[in-house]
Amino acid sequence: RKDEVIALRLFPAKMKKRAFSCSTFMIYLGVDKLYEEEPHHHVLFADDYEENVHDIQSEERVSDDMSIYIRNSSITDPHVAPEGHSALYILVPTINRRHDQDWDSFKKEYRDKVIARIEEKTSMKDLSDHIVEEEILTPANWQEDGVFVGATFNLSHNLGQMLYLRPHNQYQGFENCYLVGGGTHPGSGLPTIYESARISTNLICDQYGVDYEFVDYASDYLNGRVPRSEKTTEAVLSQ
C-alpha cells in the first residue's frame, strides 16, 4: 500500500537525523522517616554543571558528577505515604540509549552514587538507613517501555525542533494519521502535552464535522474571566 511505502521510506531516515533529549535515571523510595527540613522540590546541581550538560548532550558517557532533582512530596501531602513515612521521587538526567551503556550491570553502582550524593549534599544524612521500598528505572527500562532511545523528553528542544518545527499534529504523508505527545507540536512537558492532545482532538473533530466548544484558557486567565481561586489544574481539568 502507498501508506506503507511512505512509512518505510521516511520514518527510519527521519528519526536518525533527529536530535533527542536526555534520558533519566529514576529512583522511587518509600522511607520510614519524615524529612521535614527538606523542601518539596530540591535540585542539586553538578559541581561542574557545564561538564555535566556536555556529557549528556554529547551522548558519550554517564557523568559521575550528576545533577539530581528530589521531590519530597510528603511534607505537603500527608496522603502519599503512611504516617511518619516519606515518598521520595529522585530524577537524574543522563545519556539516552544512543550510547550503549550496560545499565543492567551498572544500575546498582550508579544508584549508590546517587544516594551517597544526596546524603552528602542535603540534610538526609541517614537516607540509606531508612529505605523500606525502592523502585529504579534506567534509560534501558524507558526504552523497553516504548520510549524511543529512552529519551524521556522525546525530541530535544533545539532551535530546529521547536514549536512549528516539531512534527505536526496531522502527519502530512497520511490522510488519517494524527500525532500527539511530547515529540509533536508544541513540545514536551505535561501542560504542553495536554495542549498537543487538544490540538489533535480538535483537528480530528474538524475532519469529521464534530462540533466542540473551543476554550481559550490562556485568554480567559489573562483577561480575568477565570477567578483566581479556580486557577488550578483541578479546576481546568474538571471543565
Regions of interest found by a model, annotated:
Residues 29, 90, 118, 177, ...:
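Hydrophobic, well-ordered secondary-structure elements that form the walls
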Residues 30-32, 82-119:
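Conserved FAD/dinucleotide-binding core of flavoprotein oxidoreductases
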Residues 205-239:
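Active-site-proximal substrate-binding core of FAD-dependent oxidoreductases
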